[in-house]
Amino acid sequence: MPIHPLNTTNHIRSTYLRYLRTIKPFQNEWYRQAFADAVDESDLLVKGPILEIALPYEKEQSIKDLVEEGVLSKEFANLQSPDLPYTRPMYVHQVRAIRKAVSGRNLVVATGTGSGKTETFLVPILNYLFREQENGTLSQPGVRAMLLYPMNALANDQMKRLRRLLENCKDITFGRYIGETDRSNDRDEAIRNFQKVYPKEKILDNELFSRKEI
């Protein structure tokens, strides 16, 4: 959906400054107003907008194409998730990265923001799990993949996507290990604690909620 860069910048600026004015609740009215004025008048807190025109990334094959070619597992057809469209063409760098990863090559992906870096490692990981499922080895215990993020917010965002993707993949277990991961040894208790924090989230049978489970 197109956005107006100036209106969006003004909205972000006003929201951010409003937040800053509330983080220091001075009891004295004079200090409170002086702090608010300093926040509003500063030209160091918000810059921009800084606009950049970027050409669209070149597209190539879809996941469906790679499945039919034999590069990826046929199990991808069963995902049926808008988070990983089966028939939508992927970017060239995504297809190249997937091919290299599936063939056992190491790689580094450097590309622009919003250009689908996640798919370059997530698709090969899912393919590896699906291949194990096909070979009957997925039930054997062990961690197959670890996704490392520098901040909880990034880990939480990825977790939301994984929950949507793997909701119907009952044989694939997954979990999130961060500071707030439940320390309980009891799964039911861990789920209750999870629901207190995320009351709207659906509980998945293949999700691991406690540190002991993970």
Q: What are the functions of these language-model segments?
A:
Residues 119, 141-167, 176-185:
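Conserved Walker A/P-loop ATP-binding site and its immediately adjacent core
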